[in-house]
Amino acid sequence: MSDNRVYSYSAVLMGSPILLKLYSHDEALASRVFQLIKRYEDLLTVNRAESQVMDINHAAGRHPVTVSRPVFQLIQCAKAASMVRDSAFNLAIGPLVKLWRIGFHGHSVPDAADIRARLALTRPQEVILDETTCSVFLQQPGMELDLGAIAKGYIADRVRDYLRQQQVEKALINLGGNVHTLGEWTIGLKKPFADAQALIGSLTINGQSVVTSGTYERYFEQDGKRWHHILDPRSGYPLDNELDSVTVISTDSLDGDIWTTLLFGLGVEKGCAALRQREDIDAIFVTKNRDIILSSPQRLRFSPLDSGYQVIDCTA
């Protein structure tokens, strides 16, 4: 029974601190939610030796691998996003991620020749899907799927669905960059390259997902330059444009994952143009010049909290 107090439960999963907020004291429910997250992590991760995705990668260039229906459907969705013309999203980016090692020990800027060689292994059209058998085949030896840009969104949606089944009316799940809600919540937007508690603004949402991707999340510095983890599958290098972060507000967190990556690749002007075709998706762009650009000021309930940033309309 709810007593109008917020109860917080936490765990470390998927390499991130996971936070669940409920309006009832229910440790058993929290435990079941964390078990659900762990189950999907075990299916989708590439950061350990065994998972269904790693089975696909190990069989690259040799034979198709049959996977569970949820994993197949997620890969199907990821391939569709990867095949969009000039897309910055690529489910086959694994060889580049491993080469750069950003966020892991031993990172450095790779040789240009090594980057070119890995780029040849990242063609999404060479990920062959067979819906009849639920099988996935990577055509070239050395190809690797990496669903890191999409797995959290998929899992956040499954948590939302599970909480709804349990008749939970108000809850928040934070998977580290992916926030999903039941009911109305106000959440903070982090200030790039600042203390963890520093915010540029707050956003009030109701039953929606908020996904933020920022260059400040994982990076290293070399030769006087900052190299971040958001890799451009077209060049093989970190995306280099006017953006520090992109936040996407959507019904499904999976869409948020896909669109943060797509919008990072498009940049502000093209990104705003793309969003005019999508009334179901909104975005907040934060630029290196300290502009906060709202795709739809009339729909977004955003309150600025840092006078060093200027809020402007996407159409301005």
From Swiss-Prot:
Keywords from the UniProt entry: Cytoplasm, FAD, Flavoprotein, Magnesium, Metal-binding, Transferase
EC number assigned by the record: 2.7.1.180
Single GO term (MF): transferase activity
Binding site for Mg(2+): 149, 257, 261
Binding site for FAD: 14, 88-90, 146, 152, 231
GO cellular component, one term: cytoplasm
Any one Pfam family match given in the protein's UniProt record, by short name: ApbE
Cofactor: Mg(2+)
Superkingdom as given in the UniProt entry: Bacteria
Keyword Magnesium: yes
Catalytic reactions of this protein: L-threonyl-[protein] + FAD = FMN-L-threonyl-[protein] + AMP + H(+)
Subcellular location: Cytoplasm
Matching InterPro entries: ApbE, ApbE-like_sf
The protein's role, per its UniProt record: Flavin transferase that catalyzes the transfer of the FMN moiety of FAD and its covalent binding to the hydroxyl group of a threonine residue in a target flavoprotein. Is responsible for the modification of the fumarate reductase KPK_2907.
Protein known as: FAD:protein FMN transferase
Organism of provenance: Klebsiella pneumoniae (strain 342)
Taxonomic lineage: Bacteria, Pseudomonadati, Pseudomonadota, Gammaproteobacteria, Enterobacterales
Gene: apbE2
